A protein has these predicted regions:
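Conserved catalytic core of the tyrosine transesterase superfamily
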Residues: 1-325
Length: 325
């Protein structure tokens, strides 16, 4: 467990202070705590006694190790950046390193209104090629699941693994536990989405003959629906749209999240609302660990401005209501 980690270098009190501060803000900070233990060992191994970070005493830490992936290197540097900021805040002037290792940003497919209409038509019309009652039930889950992904901008993993204990439909809230970035958060549903989910849960309870454990049960109801199953279904249904063979970049399930975010920013622009004002709220809704992650979408919007040209349409006009079969 992260709370059993013992730091012993001259930076130990500051590392402990940083981890406590992060956890008090709601971050789990488990993986980062172990990386900081590695940094604590690095500090000891080099016999550093100082309590400030400099380019010189960080040189060895910032080097990419043999067979070390870019992602892990970024994580190692990232915790030191956080520590440097923490030290600076306490008056210990420290060097803040730059993350030189970069990922190539993937091209995203921001779905247009017409693409969304066709996609959700296929989702709502989907019927399995079998009369198996569990596959029939799952066909009823997909319209809700994909609406949750699109209307709430949630990640696919946290959506699939949503348990009923995390769902409060009286308050219209999902509690996302230990999401990406190791931070819990609340996701608020609109009144329409809340009503839709209530009807859906009533359906699940009736079909299963008991209160469901998972909001999106898999074929075996004691387990949640799998991410590969959702991706495969999305791909199969996208292929049935008229856009499948005409778009340059095939969309993924995750692009529903990108489309949600892009539409929110465009809507604010139409209403004259500053993106900077809304940035903290959007960042919290998406579960980002930093505003920099959310800022990424601002550039997507600039690139996709001409693609999503009907920005004033509400999602309810684009996505039809779910009809129970």
């Amino acid at each position: 467990m992260a709370n059993e980690i013992v730091y012993v270098s001259s930076l130990a009190p500051f590392i402990e202070g940083l981890t406590k501060e992060k956890r008090s803000c709601g971050f789990k900070y488990h993986r980062q705590a172990y990386l900081l233990k590695d940094f604590d060992d690095y500090w000891l191994d080099n016999d550093y006694k100082e309590t400030v970070l400099t380019p010189e005493n960080l040189e060895g830490w910032l080097q990419q190790k043999e067979n070390e992936g870019t992602g892990y290197l970024r994580n190692r540097i990232g915790v030191v950046i956080e520590l440097a900021k923490y030290l600076n805040g306490l008056g210990y002037k420290s060097y803040i390193p730059k993350v030189e290792a970069r990922y190539e940003v993937p091209i995203r497919h921001i779905l247009t209104n017409q693409e969304l209409k066709e996609l959700f038509y296929q989702i709502d019309s989907y019927k399995p090629d079998t009369s198996d009652k569990d596959f029939v039930r799952m066909a009823e889950e997909y319209p809700i699941l994909f609406r949750v992904l699109y209307h709430l901008g949630m990640r696919i993993q946290e959506t699939c693994s949503l348990s009923m204990s995390q769902v409060d439909l009286e308050k219209g809230v999902f509690t996302i536990l230990d999401g990406k970035g190791n931070k819990d958060r609340l996701v608020y549903l609109s009144d329409d989405m809340t009503s839709l989910c209530k009807v859906y849960v009533e359906y699940l309870t009736r079909i299963l003959g008991e209160s469901p454990k998972w909001f999106f049960p898999g074929k075996k109801s004691e387990t949640h629906i799998s991410v590969p199953a959702v991706r495969a279904t999305f791909n199969a249904l996208w292929k049935k749209t008229s856009f499948a063979n005409t778009c340059n970049k095939k969309p993924t399930v995750h692009d529903l999240r990108h489309t949600y975010t892009t539409e929110r920013i465009n809507k604010w622009a139409e209403q004259g609302i500053s993106f900077k004002e809304m940035l903290p709220y959007l960042s919290k809704q998406l579960g980002h660990k930093s505003y920099q992650e959310t800022n990424y979408y601002y550039h997507i919007v600039e690139d996709a401005y001409n693609v999503i040209h009907e920005k004033d349409k509400t999602s309810s006009e684009v996505i039809p209501e779910v009809k129970r079969r």
